[in-house]
Regions:
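A basic- and aromatic-enriched beta-loop-alpha substructure that forms the phosphate/nucleotide-
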Residues: 116-195
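Catalytic metal-binding acidic patch
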Residues: 94-128, 216
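Conserved nucleotidyltransferase catalytic core and NTase-mimicking acidic/glycine-rich helix/loop elements
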Residues: 163-288
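Short, amphipathic C-terminal "tail helix"
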Residues: 283-306
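Basic/aromatic-rich interaction segments and small domains that mediate binding to polyanionic partners
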Residues: 1-61
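Short beta-strand or tight-loop elements
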Residues: 30, 84, 101
Length: 306
């Protein structure tokens, strides 16, 4: 997978030596800030160095400084190529997208063995704010999914999978292992606390974050289905128009609150009747992680001719 586009303001490290606009040499490892990006398919980046020099680089010649601090350039440059799963989540996966909606991507990458074994370890995530993309290192994604983190579970259950590799397919194959009664604590508990906060803001300032209210109701419905049916639905289906009306502020707060309370009661019944286990399948996650690490190690041995 190619490196994602960098926004202006990103601190970067140069992978190659170049000359700036004045003909001054800029060494490998030079640190600067992206000040401009052209819109051509093969984007070039204008980077301002601390002394004011402004060399140009291609995307492949730059490393995000936060990532470079974790590992040497020769290793970091390949991390974007190690994405094993990329899924669209958010409004587009929920069936709630409007013309103004972003396309949010989440997924995982598999760190190369030398980076995973190093003292610094691999970065927990690769992030691109321009494209609204975040790829967790495999272990981090597994940890989040075992805790029933909504973003992690949604990237595993999204109907909009843009990219997978064999390890990514193996990860999707065990996604049901992460569903358990923990979903109730995470989804129901978060919605309850957030609605209390929104109600307090409404009383004090007369303001309601209608978009947030819409997504909390959607999450409650998804969690209920997960407990009842053993899978996590993302698309809201027949509830689309009602949820979008809430987002537009066209539904009275009292009606939103009534729906929310009804969903909490439904969630309580669902967790009492669910066939899901009390805890997720840690062994399945462990087995997958070990397999993924062995795969990364075998790549290293193969590269070394072993």
């Amino acid at each position: 997978m190619p490196p994602l586009r960098l926004p202006t303001g990103t601190q970067v490290v140069a992978r190659i030596p170049v000359k700036d606009q004045s003909g001054v040499d800029r060494a490998t490892g030079s640190v600067g800030v992206v000040v401009a990006v052209d819109d051509l398919p093969d984007s070039t980046y204008l980077v301002q160095d601390p002394d004011g020099g402004e060399p140009r680089y291609s995307r492949s010649d730059l490393i995000v400084r936060a990532e470079a601090q974790w590992a040497p350039p020769a290793t970091v440059q390949n991390l974007w190529d190690r994405v094993i799963l990329s899924s669209v989540i958010g409004s587009r996966a929920y069936g709630l997208a409007t013309d103004a909606s972003d396309t949010d991507r989440r997924g995982a990458y598999l760190a190369p063995a030398p980076l995973d074994w190093s003292l610094r370890g691999a970065p927990e995530q690769l992030q691109d704010d321009v494209r609204q993309a975040c790829f967790w290192e495999v272990k981090k994604l597994l940890t989040l999914a075992l805790k029933a983190n909504p973003n992690a579970l949604e990237c595993l259950y999204s109907p909009l999978v843009e990219h997978t590799t064999p390890p990514g397919e193996e990860l999707l194959a065990i996604r049901s292992s992460f569903l358990s009664k923990v979903v109730y604590a995470t989804y129901n508990g978060y919605a309850l606390s957030q609605f209390k906060k929104m109600d307090a803001d409404r009383r004090m300032r007369g303001e309601v974050n209608w978009k947030h209210a819409m997504h909390l109701l959607r999450a409650l419905m998804a969690g209920i289905v997960a407990l009842r049916e053993g899978h996590l639905p993302l698309d809201v289906g027949a509830h689309r128009e009602q949820l979008l009306a809430i987002r537009r502020g066209e539904i009275a707060w009292s009606d939103v609150e009534s729906w929310r309370l009804s969903l909490h009661r439904e969630f309580d019944r669902a967790v009492a009747d669910t066939r899901l286990p009390d805890r997720p399948d840690y062994q399945a996650a462990e087995t997958f992680l070990i397999s993924a690490r062995l795969r990364a190690a075998s790549e290293l041995l193969g590269d070394n001719g072993a």
